[in-house]
C-alpha cells in the first residue's frame, strides 16, 4: 500500500516487475521523510539558489508582440545551470539518493539535458553515474554527450529498437532491475511508476512558485494563458502546478506533431494515442491495436517519446488543461523568430510552446492578454540541427 496516491484518476500506478516494488515503496518513504527534514530542504534550497542559479527571470518580450495588445512573458529555465529545467529535480533526486546511501545513479536521456543535469549533480555530490541514450540521439546531440563525459558520466549508446528515448528508458529500467540495491534510477520526467510523477512534480514546482510571484509583482494579476511543451511532461507540470487551482488561467501543453499528424511521424499520444501500459504506468501511449508501442518522432529529441505523464492525462480528462500539437517546421520558425527578434536561443523543445503562443497572438492582435511561455531549455544543443535543415535557408 502506498502512502501517497499512486493514481491520477485512472492514470498512473506501479506497473513494474515484482522485484522492484520494495524499491519503489522505499523510495516513497524516503521522499516523504526528506520533505519533512529541514536539513534536506535547506540543502536543496541552497543548491538551487547558489549552484543552479534560481530564481530564473520572467522576461517580457518587447519586440515579438509589437503592434499587438498581447504581453508575452518567457519563464527563463534556459538560464538555469545545466541549460534546462532538468537541474531542478535532478538536484532533489541526487540529494535523496545520497540520503538513501546509494552509490550509483542510473538515468536515461533524449536531448541530453537530463543527462547533463544528472552528470553535474553526480559530480557535485560524488556519485557514479551511467546514462542511457538512444544511438540516434547520441548522433544528434554530440555536444551534450561530450558535456556528460567531461563531468565523469558513462554514456551508454542504445542500439535497440528505434535508438531513441523510449529505448533508453527501457534499458535504464532493465539496469535498475538488476542493481536497485546500490543504485537509484533518476527518471528525467514526470512519468514512470509511482512515486516518480509525484516526486518530479514536487521538485519542478519551483518553476510555478516563482512564476506566480513574478507575474503578480510585474502585472498585479495572473496570466490569461500558460504554455509549455510536453514530452513526458516535467517542465509543464512544474509551471502548471501553482496555477491548477486558478480556473481563470488557461493551461496549454504542446506536443510534437513532427512531420505532420497524418504522416504518423509525430509524438502526440495525448491527442492521437490510447490508454495503455508503458514505462511502469498507465497513461496515453502511441500504440497499435495489439498494444505494441509505436515509434514516436520529433525533431526535438526531448519530445521524442511515445507516452506522457499520468497527471497530464488526468488534467486533460477533467478539462483543466488543453493539449495541442506543433509541427517540426512550426517549431523551427518560432526558434528563428525568438533568436532574431529577442536575442534568445531557445531549445527546440521549448520552441514548440513558443510556436503555439505565436499562433494565438496572430489570431487576434487586438486581444488584450498576458501569455507566459516556459522556455524549458536553451538551444545551444540544437544549433547543428538547425544549420542542417533546408527550411532554415533564407
UniProtKB/Swiss-Prot annotation:
Q: What is its EC number?
A: 4.2.1.20
- Any idea which UniProt keywords this protein has? Amino-acid biosynthesis, Aromatic amino acid biosynthesis, Lyase, Pyridoxal phosphate, Tryptophan biosynthesis
Q: What GO CC terms are in its UniProt record?
A: cytoplasm
Family to which this protein belongs: Belongs to the TrpB family.
Top EC class of this enzyme: lyase
Q: Which Gene3D superfamilies match?
A: 3.40.50.1100
Q: Which reaction(s) are listed as its catalytic activity? A: (1S,2R)-1-C-(indol-3-yl)glycerol 3-phosphate + L-serine = D-glyceraldehyde 3-phosphate + L-tryptophan + H2O
Which Pfam families does the record associate with it?
PALP
Provenance organism: Buchnera aphidicola subsp. Baizongia pistaciae (strain Bp)
Q: In which pathway does it act?
A: Amino-acid biosynthesis; L-tryptophan biosynthesis; L-tryptophan from chorismate: step 5/5
Question: Which residues, renumbered to this chain, carry the PTM N6-(pyridoxal phosphate)lysine?
Answer: 86
What's this protein's name? Answer: Tryptophan synthase beta chain
Q: Could you cite one Gene Ontology molecular function of this protein?
A: tryptophan synthase activity
